[in-house]
Amino acid sequence: MARTAHIVRETSESHIDLELNLDGTGKTDIDTSVPFYNHMMTALGKHSLIDLTIHAHGDTDIDVHHTVEDTAIVFGEALKQALGDKKGIRRFADATVPLDEALAKAVVDISGRPYCVCSGEPEGYEFCMIGGHFTGSLVRHVLESIAFHAGICLHMQVLAGRDPHHIAEAEFKALARALRFAVEIDPRVDGVPSTKGAL
């Protein structure tokens, strides 16, 4: 069965059209109308090997927050939908990714219990403007929105970093690498990887 999802979400603040394939090769077509976010979501697709198409627009004349948040919500929902009953997945994964002076570690559990813990960001990171429109605080908000709507437990730890762009990119790439292995089918797993029999 194909592990794919296609979700369209429309509100008074944004229009999101997102399609993904968990068993892809990392092909992406991203246009969120927020250039730095395009860069991050392209990296997420590329390094997770999830084929990802996003066409999004919204009230960015007010702020990019609504479009960024709603895109993350839909990505999380699509991830949950594509995972289906979660039979055969590896479930747990972690990845540590550097980008020059920055280093980020992501740990993922596709548990069905949404949780997100972010730690280690340097002081003032949340106030930094990255790429002209994207604040450091939005990185955490994106991670939380993905985790809550995908039903996954995510721990993101910034281990080192000075440049806000590098820190954010290391975080997105670490999440990508962790997702790549967590969603992968393990041929040795029979059924759902939980002693409860359900996730």
From Swiss-Prot:
Q: Which domain of life is it from?
A: Bacteria
* This protein's GO CC annotations: cytoplasm
Subcellular location(s): the record lists: Cytoplasm
- Its top-level enzyme class, in one word, is lyase
Presence of keyword DNA damage: no
Q: Give the pathway.
A: Amino-acid biosynthesis; L-histidine biosynthesis; L-histidine from 5-phospho-alpha-D-ribose 1-diphosphate: step 6/9
Tell me a GO biological process for this protein.
L-histidine biosynthetic process
The reaction(s) annotated as catalysed by this protein in its Swiss-Prot or TrEMBL entry are: D-erythro-1-(imidazol-4-yl)glycerol 3-phosphate = 3-(imidazol-4-yl)-2-oxopropyl phosphate + H2O
- Which keywords does the record carry? Amino-acid biosynthesis, Cytoplasm, Histidine biosynthesis, Lyase
Q: Which CDD domains match?
A: IGPD
Pfam families named in the record: IGPD
Chief localisation class? cytoplasm
Stated EC number for the protein is: 4.2.1.19
Return the HAMAP family for the record. Answer: HisB (MF_00076)
Sorted alphabetically, which NCBIfam families does this protein's record hold? PRK00951.1-6, PRK00951.2-1, PRK00951.2-4
Entry similarity comment = Belongs to the imidazoleglycerol-phosphate dehydratase family.
Instruction: Please report the name of this protein according to its UniProt entry.
Output: Imidazoleglycerol-phosphate dehydratase
Q: Write down the species.
A: Bifidobacterium longum (strain DJO10A)
- Taxonomic lineage: Bacteria, Bacillati, Actinomycetota, Actinomycetes, Bifidobacteriales
Give the encoding gene's name.
hisB
